[in-house]
Amino acid sequence: MNSNQNRLLQSSVFPLFFLLIIWAVFYFDVTYKLNLHQYGLMPLSARGLIGIFTMPLLHGDLGHIASNSLPLLVLGICLFYFYREIAFKVFFISYISCGVLVWLFAQRDIHNSVHIGASGLIYALAGFLVVSGIIRKHKALFGISLLVIFLYGTIIWGVLPSEYQKAIHYIEDGKNISWEGHLFGFLTGVCLAYVYRKIGIQQPVYSWDINNDDDVDESNPYWLEGTEEENKPKDDTQQDAFKNTSDNPYTVNYTFIPKKDVE
């Protein structure tokens, strides 16, 4: 097993473990009819505060959990493979922040509906991977951004209010989704991409990209500098010799010879 395969295996451990927890919760809920969705997140409700921690673990039916499983696994592996230094921070901050924002700002309807599902976390991971790859300007990370857009680009419509999603036929009539969870999850991911932009893989810096203008001594511009010999200080011997020749100048005598004498 080479280093890349080993790294991929290590990056898959936590996403698979988290996915196993979600499926275990769903299995016990369905098998023993525990009605766990009552512990989902209810906005601006003391009883619904527990949903900040339980919302991503709870799902309404098999279709709901199945639709969330694959993107959660793929995005989670990408996060831990390419951003291993900050992967746990991004994951758990997204987990908690999404729930807190939904609890604070999501609308509470007359039916006291609860928010459940890991889709908010999925939107956070997608937002982080897309934006982080763009602002870091690293080829591999930018490629991951394009891959996420290609695979899950259409989920951007999920941040719109439900009535707009129904109008464009993104969701079926009579189906309700936690679009606030999608929106706040995506915004959380974008913010984390900016906050952690200096940590982890960075764009390579080449020698020709380095600006050395700060090293120039503007008090002595290079265009006013003389040659090395011109700037070299004269020693005392040279200065004394020059002084002596100035005090006692040489005499040069010229002799004129007529042209006829030359012939």
Please describe what each predicted stretch is.
Residues 81-90, 131-144, 199-203:
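Alpha-helical transmembrane bundle and helix-membrane interface signal
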Residues 22-27, 96-104, 147-158:
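Aromatic-anchored segments of alpha-helical transmembrane domains
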Residues 62-67, 112-131, 135-141, 179-187:
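Membrane-interface loop-to-helix entry segments
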Residues 1-7, 159-263:
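C-terminal transmembrane module of polytopic alpha-helical membrane proteins
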Residues 68-83, 124-134, 187-199:
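Membrane-interfacial alpha-helical segments at the cytosolic side of multi-pass membrane proteins
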Residues 117, 123-171:
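Multi-pass alpha-helical transmembrane bundles in non-GPCR membrane proteins
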Residues 18-22, 93-94, 98, 102, ...:
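Alpha-helical transmembrane segments in multi-pass membrane proteins
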Residues 8-90, 103-115, 168-173, 177:
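N-terminal TM1-TM2 helical hairpin plus the immediately adjacent luminal interfacial "cap"
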